[in-house]
Amino acid sequence: MSQLYDEIGVGYQHRRRPDPRLAAAIIRALDDAETVVNVGAGAGSYEPSDRSVVAVEPAMTMIRQRRPDGAPVVQASANDLPFRDEAFTASLAILTVHHWPDQARGLAELARVARGRVVIVTWDPLWSGFWLVDDYFPEITDLDRQIFPTIEDFQRTFGRIEVRSFPVPHDCIDGFMGAYWRRPHAYLDPSVRAAISAFAKAEPSWLESGLARLRRDLADGTWERRHAHLFEQSELELGYRIIIAERD
C-alpha cells in the first residue's frame, strides 16, 4: 500500500476531498466514541474534529499532504499497529482495507486496539451493476474482486456485524471510483483517474481501449441514450458499505 500511494498520492487531496454526506454517515457509525484511531488514514479525510483522533498512515507522500492542524499521525502499517490493546474507543478504516498486504492480520489489529467498535468503509465485491466497469472497464471488476474482502470475511473476523449501505450522491465531491456516476466525462480526465487506485493499477492496453469507447459513446450520444435514466436519480447504489463491529 505504501508504495502504491507513494506513486499515485501526489495531489491526492485535491480530488479526494471529504464528502459531507459520507462524513455524516461515518460520524453516525462511530456513535459516541471519544477516541478514534484512523488506520490507512491518507491525507486525513473524514477524521472527526469533535473527538480525539490518532492517524496511522504508511505512505510519506500522503502524510505530507495532511493539514498542519490535523490529527497527529504515526507512520506505520495496519498489520502492526504500535498501540496497546484497547487503546481507543473505536478504530476506523476508510476505503483502505483492500490495499493491505495481510488483510486478516490488519482486521485483527483493528479489533485489538478498539475497546468499543470497529468502523470500516469498504466496497462489496459481490455487488455488480456500475456502467463504468460493465461497459468500459470489466477488468477492474476482476481486479477488485481479488482484493476487496467480502462481507463474509468481515463476519469471520468480527462475528456479528452491522452492514449499512452508502448510496453515492450524484454530486459527490470525494473522487473515489463511483463518485462520477452521473458525470461520465470526468473519467476521461487523467487527474481524476490519478486519484483512483484501480486506474493506477490498470494495464495500458485495456485502459486505453476502455477510454476510447467511453470517449466515442459520449461524443455520439450512445452513453446518454443508454443511461438517460441516471439523470433522474440523486443518488445511486454502487456497492459501498459501512461495516460496524461491536467489541464490547
Q: What residues fall within each predicted segment?
A:
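A conserved beta-strand element that flanks and buttresses the S-adenosyl-L-methionine
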Residues: 92
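A short glycine-rich, Lys/Arg-flanked "PGG" loop and its adjoining helix->strand segment in the class I
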Residues: 104-118
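Conserved class I S-adenosyl-L-methionine
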Residues: 1-37, 45, 60-65, 117-149, 171-178, 182, ...
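Short catalytic micro-motifs in class I SAM-dependent methyltransferases
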Residues: 95-99
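Conserved Class I S-adenosyl-L-methionine
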Residues: 162-248
